[in-house]
């Protein structure tokens, strides 16, 4: 199979979808790998490393899309890439369709096969291609939130860990999955007073048993969230419904319960966001203020640490890339029901239920 690796062009997206080591594995199996010039440079991989692995370098993104049977990316195609995706081409990347009608419509019109990292499942229903980036995003959410709590950044001027004789800052984590777990661990490690809220009692029980002593658990409801907000400095939104839009757990009206200068970090923004007042931001302009509350809503948080996140991502994706290249998408999906769940749009038709539910009016 001919595999194309374009350079990511989303704002400050520094990851790359395939390392030279991954390219070497594919070439060894008889596949042809084309990599766009400097695609890996921000992750620490020069063109020469890909060439040494047996890949070929192409000068432009148009060249890569034009020749490849399978495009492997990190983030969804942006508007300038829509015309490059063609009928019958397999595109394997994070799509997050449910929060982006324009992208969904463009991929329907392209006639391509869209296989989404975020809905591929393991037999136990965990999400193997979402987990590594959720780990990174969860940890970074606290790192970034702590930074914007600083007064020069517009925050209230709180040090999350406190100091002897001064209370630590308070962090509320909404969602106890992979993102929430990692966010709570990071916040706890800084010495913050952490509360993690979730709807699953078994999950809360597990977290209560395994988390550090400065992490408390809370059954999530509008009432319990409202009770927590007046004393909270940093809120991490970490809810996930696979493939679907995130629910709004904090409304505009609830912002008045927070003290001015508090920070909301919405890790669920790539699925539409879990705060009513959220809209996507970029690493170049990461925050905005509504009702004196800072909102950090960067949709590609791990893109800021590519030398960590590229390796974490490609460790997980490479076995699937090899399977798709070796068997073709139809045979590979037939043999692996978990991979088949990654199919979101196939040749003009929405095939993933949560995406179809998000856009009932879209027709092929």
For the regions a language model picked out, list residue spans one by one:
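Short glycine-/small-residue-rich Rossmann-like dinucleotide-binding loops
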Residues: 69, 75-76, 95-96, 221, ...
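Adenosine-phosphate binding glycine-rich loop
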Residues: 118-159, 269, 274-364
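Rossmann-like adenosine-cofactor binding region
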Residues: 209-291
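Glycine/serine-rich phosphate-binding loop and adjoining beta1-alpha1 elements at the start
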Residues: 2, 8, 77-169, 298-300
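Glycine-rich phosphate/diphosphate-binding loop of Rossmann-like nucleotide-binding domains
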Residues: 6-45, 152-240, 287
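An N-terminal-biased, well-structured beta-alpha scaffold segment characteristic
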Residues: 2-106, 110
